[in-house]
UniProtKB/Swiss-Prot annotation:
Family: Belongs to the EF-Ts family.
Protein name, per record: Elongation factor Ts
Originating organism: Cyanothece sp. (strain PCC 7425 / ATCC 29141)
InterPro entries to which the protein is assigned, alphabetical: EF-Ts_dimer_sf (IPR036402), Transl_elong_EFTs/EF1B (IPR001816), Transl_elong_EFTs/EF1B_dimer (IPR014039), Transl_elong_Ts_CS (IPR018101), UBA-like_sf (IPR009060)
GO cellular component, one term: cytoplasm
Family matches, as PROSITE patterns: EF_TS_1 (PS01126), EF_TS_2 (PS01127)
Disulfide bonds: none
Region spans: Involved in Mg(2+) ion dislocation from EF-Tu: 82-85
Biased composition (Basic residues): 254-263
Gene3D superfamilies linked: 1.10.286.20, DNA helicase RuvA subunit, C-terminal domain, Elongation factor Ts, dimerisation domain
Main location: cytoplasm
Function (record text): Associates with the EF-Tu.GDP complex and induces the exchange of GDP to GTP. It remains bound to the aminoacyl-tRNA.EF-Tu.GTP complex up to the GTP hydrolysis stage on the ribosome.
Keywords: Cytoplasm, Elongation factor, Protein biosynthesis
Amino acid sequence: MAEITAQLVKQLRDKTGAGMMDCKKALQETGGEMEKAIDWLRQKGLASAGKKAGRLTAEGLVDSYIHTGGRIGVLVEVNCETDFVARNEAFRSLVQDIAKQIAACPNVEYVSIDEIPPATVEREKAIAMGSDALKGKPENVKEKIVQGKMDKTLRELCLLDQPFIRDQSITVEELIKQAIAQLGENVKVRRFVRFVMGEGIEKEEANLAEEVAAQIAAKEAPPAVVEAPVAETPEPAVAETPEAKPAATESKPAKSKSAKKKK
């Protein structure tokens, strides 16, 4: 097997336009033989993708995918160079595959590793450095272990580094490179958003033990004594005293004239 040097990788890149990592992998897969490496890249659809990587992508498609049951939804924007390709069925199928890929990857937050904020990188590094597994190890060994853990963690956050759900032998990045070779235009995933039903809403989870204890206590508690209301004795009614009326004056009967004469 020929030694795979940086110069050999550069030669393959100049001949094919493929990315440096793709060229290195092609040489590794073919034992360092240039012609076989070129054929390998062509079979993977990577031979011309690198030449188109820097071209402007101002057209494209915004597509959506709703997973069965409506619990997960995805919106994704994928760009290409021309409206002609944007209306191509192969391009539309690629965008739909990418949307499904995002739905299937709950940890993915960024398109590529270049988009990860420095603060996130530093936080992951601090977590890796604080691992108990590093205690007692030399500093140079620690650096290698930490770098390996960080690379793995950060790549899990990136869409392009995920194994393609329909073909685990390639990544999403390699899938896109194949599409570039097939369509003859540069293709880029610009942005995406993944929705999960109920995400961010805190649900109050009942404690089963506490709930059972409360039910038992309610059953064992003695029945509450309900006191009958005391009827109020009505106050006796006060009889009203009738107002005194003036006594009637008795009138004496008048004597008749005949009685006076007899005297």
